[in-house]
Amino acid sequence: YNIDVFKHTLLILSEGDFGAKNLSFYKENLQIKKLEENSIIKAFFINENTYLLISIGSEIELIDKSLKNIKKFNFSHSSLNDAVLNEDKSRLVAGFESGEVELFDLKNWKMLKNYDKMHKDNIYQVDFKNNVILSCGTDRRIGVVKNEEQNFLQKDFLIYTCALSPSGEFAVYSDNEAGVSEVFSTSDFKPVKTFNNENLMSEFIIFLNNKDFIVSGFGDSIMFRSIDE
């Protein structure tokens, strides 16, 4: 489901037996722990001894190294589809089936903002870099929150995946119908570059730096792309 890294230790959320979820840790050896809750869709390090679990049931939970509950929060929304943390793991951005995007303060454990002007329907993915928020979904929109302003690009195809560069200057999304990925500026929404996905159905995009990114999808191949190529 997802992987996180903290001080050379991997945290891995994966499928267990009979639909269960496992939380595994790998540094010099592999430790596998079974989660009690099967609805977890993502897991993150907060620090070396504290982890954050994200549930499709719109709940987040802070747990300790023994997987014991520290505290919970319920967003009281429809399904939570995706969530990401900022660089210092102090804030979380979540995207919901309702089309809302929410900003949550993990240190003070409270809601900060609700962004409801960008989407009308189900959000597939969100990203959060350098105080810029990106979202994409079934309403064929790419949403951007920058300097607290909500804006969106309207397209004519479903947008399953999107990502931000570390600076938040660039965003990229994939059009699987046309088989391309397009980079645009988050300041003026002008296109920067379009890439052919070479028959890859894009599912995830990760920026390595402000110019280079990886596109992966269904299958066993990944593509390395650069805005400078």
Language-model segment annotations:
Residues 29-35, 68-74, 110-116, 148-154, ...:
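A short beta-strand motif characteristic of beta-propeller blades
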Residues 10, 51-52, 92, 133, ...:
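Hydrophobic beta-strand positions that form the internal "hydrophobic ladder"
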Residues 3, 43-44, 83, 126, ...:
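Hydrophobic core register within WD40 beta-propeller blades
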Residues 5-7, 46-48, 87-88, 128-130, ...:
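Residue-level detector of Asp-centered blade-edge/turn motifs that repeat once per structural unit
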Residues 17-21, 57-60, 81, 98-102, ...:
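Short coil/turn segments within WD40 beta-propeller repeats
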Residues 24-27, 63-64, 105, 146, ...:
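Structural recognition of the beta-propeller blade-terminating site
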Residues 35-40, 74-80, 116-123, 153-161, ...:
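WD40/WD-repeat beta-propeller blade N-cap
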Residues 201-229:
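Blade-level signature of beta-propeller repeat domains, shared across WD40, Kelch, NHL, RCC1
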